[in-house]
Amino acid sequence: MVIGADTFWPDVNGAARFTERLAAGLVQRGHDVHVVAPNQAYRSVKPRIEVIEGEAMTLHRLPSVRWAPHDWLRFIWPWRSKHYARKVLDEVRPDVVHIQSHIIIGRGLSRIAHQRGIPVIATNHVMAENILDHTTMPKFIDDIMLHLAWADAKRTFDLTRAVTTPTRRAADFLERTVDVEGVIPISCGIDRTQYTPVVAPREKNRIVFVGRLTAEKQVDVILRAMTKLDPALDVSFDIVGGGDQRKMLEGLTHQLGLQDRVTFHGRISDAELRGLLSRASLFVIASVAELQSIATMEAMASALPIVAADAVALPHLVHDGQNGYLFEPGNVAELAARLTDVLTADPAEYERMQRASLDGVAVHDINRTLDTFEALYRGEALPD
């Protein structure tokens, strides 16, 4: 099979992480997996074996250029996507193509695969609004581009056997926005055995955020909420991830006088991340553009209460008053109050929230995700 992705290792974001785990899981199940993704330079390379998530698979890395306003986003020239698609499909002759984005690589693969009668499955991880954060163009041009992007997405999705997205809320959003029917919600899934939940009160109050430091993540809202917390709580804030907003956020941290309480870790190893999650008191996310949030699921698998913005798909994971709290997006005072609710909870209440996170993430097991996609690839009925 061929998996097409506009972002893949070494990129660090939810879509790339899911695609890596999907590909590795399919290899473990005996499938011959070929991944088509941007190269890290504008250079042609032959297909090669790479080890991803501990599994060997064939990577077809395509010449790409970096989008100048962004620190890591790379793309292939759109007018070359069909050429590369023909080349890969000629060589691999797959039984099925699974695209992870309708933007460039997936767009080309879907059209050529459709012409050749190869079934196409499309998974949407993208909100076009996120991409527009990096255009640096006037809003009226962004609005035109947004309309054109979703119209083109519909043309791509109309060529597929099935369209999936990580949650029911995200599926509803896609059906409304793109005018497609029957979008199937399939969780990105995680391997819960890879995380170490510590169900117990914490000695220190540590909150953590994991994700790209981009505008839609609204990490600045969390920093401002930190200034409204009771100093007696002695709260520290760990920020994991890189992005184009990092310098601005570091400057804001100093401006707010938080430099002794906030640590920017950048990109860290999986082992370091799991250790950080196991030591944290809670996970916080202020993002307004999450179609699921693998980082939130990882925190839940680590038995952390979650404080999240009440936006898009986050309420699918965070049930207010159960495994944490929701707050109005952008509302600094409400976020500070919800953080305080978790940090001042008595031991029994804190443990109840921890166990609710563990219970809530159980339905997102990666094996269920793989079972469902295999059924789609084969054109079979989906598992219950």
Task: Give the location of each predicted region.
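Conserved acidic donor-binding segment of nucleotide-sugar-dependent glycosyltransferases
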Residues: 320-321, 325-332, 341-347
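N-terminal subdomain of nucleotide-sugar transferases
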Residues: 1-61, 368
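Short alpha-helical donor nucleotide-sugar binding micro-motif in glycosyltransferases
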Residues: 89, 157, 267-268, 275-280
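Nucleotide-activated donor-binding/catalytic signature segment of Leloir-type glycosyltransferases, i.e.
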Residues: 250-268
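Conserved donor-binding/catalytic core segment of Leloir-type glycosyltransferases
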Residues: 199-226, 238
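Aromatic "clamp/platform" in nucleotide-sugar-dependent glycosyltransferases that forms part
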Residues: 288
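Short hydrophobic beta-strand element within catalytic cores of glycosyltransferases
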Residues: 305-308
